[in-house]
Amino acid sequence: MANLSGYNFAYLDEQTKRMIRRAILKAVAIPGYQVPFGGREMPMPYGWGTGGIQLTASVIGESDVLKVIDQGADDTTNAVSIRNFFKRVTGVNTTERTDDATVIQTRHRIPETPLTEDQIIIFQVPIPEPLRFIEPRETETRTMHALEEYGVMQVKLYEDIARFGHIATTYAYPVKVNGRYVMDPSPIPKFDNPKMDMMPALQLFGAGREKRIYAVPPFTRVESLDFDDHPFTVQQWDEPCAICGSTHSYLDEVVLDDAGNRMFVCSDTDYCRQQSEAKNQ
């Protein structure tokens, strides 16, 4: 039962949960397609993960174990506030270990630890429309998706190559899902894009401000857009994580002092802790 009296389990009323679950089913049936839903007011402002919170509230059960991360970290403001919110309105167990979680809500990262078929990962999405900055009119972008007119996206990537010699997009890198819809993977770094391809876990995306839900079912093909002569590549670092020594995880740059000294550490705090423990054994 919920710890906070006076509220329904997971805050949302059951009719709203059913409405969101129907939208999820449609999104799973049409991978990458943006499904409108009647978003509700949540006890936090838009831009702080209201879309992801509504998805989590609709799928979480009393036996689930919840993990919430923000930019890969478990201890940042957004992650802590959302985790405490669900602890109060559901009473479910929470964890910082990716392996132990059944539901993972994330802002802007995919965990380094591979996910399994028993897990659901829920992304907080600020702007669900990948064509928004090319064509701002929603009526036009819906038509472009329907007709599969994605040439303008390829032109945008080509303009990067013409200006910089490479595709300069480093986050929210557009992907094609199941060979059909171009999708915004949320502002995850492009380093995480390959993890989405054939992932065993169900991937759900919620945009609270724009009231859109979309999904990538388990074991679905997800391809990052590129060109034959400019294939998709991920970021590389010249040095390992300063804490655990990992050479194959996404690293954050941390400035140490006013002299400009800096170090690189794993963005995923749980993965970094696991690597450190394994190294010390």
Swiss-Prot record:
Listed GO CC annotations: alpha-D-ribose 1-methylphosphonate 5-triphosphate synthase complex; carbon phosphorus lyase complex
EC identifiers of the protein: 4.7.1.1
Domain of life, source organism: Bacteria
GO BP terms in the entry: organic phosphonate catabolic process; organic phosphonate metabolic process; organic phosphonate transport
Other facts: The sequence shown is that of strain K12.
Record's function text: Catalyzes the breakage of the C-P bond in alpha-D-ribose 1-methylphosphonate 5-phosphate (PRPn) forming alpha-D-ribose 1,2-cyclic phosphate 5-phosphate (PRcP).
Protein's UniProt name: Alpha-D-ribose 1-methylphosphonate 5-phosphate C-P lyase
Organism, as annotated: Escherichia coli (strain K12)
Lineage of source species: Bacteria, Pseudomonadati, Pseudomonadota, Gammaproteobacteria, Enterobacterales
Underlying gene: phnJ
